[in-house]
Amino acid sequence: MNELYRVIEKKIKASGYPRAISGEAVYDDICDQIDGKENGMYILMSKFEKDVVFEYHITILDDDFNLGLLTMRTPEGVFETNFDR
């Protein structure tokens, strides 16, 4: 899992996101957001920090999920990363 967390952090930092980020915290937030949801495609919004909103574009499968796009809305600006690339 540590490698997955590092990949998440790397992709977010590459978007120009100006704040400290934990790949594990993002992964845990996604898991909390999708808990109990049916298979399908979703756009989920999460107040990741007091003044930061993360918008996840996720496809939920039987035993897994795919995070396509992540948009991070902060006072510093809007940052986006595509996890499918």
Over which residues does each language-model region extend?
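Acidic, low-complexity, intrinsically disordered interaction modules
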Residues: 19-83
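N-terminal trafficking/processing presequences and adjacent post-cleavage segments
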Residues: 1-24
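Short intrinsically disordered terminal tails
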Residues: 1-2, 83-85
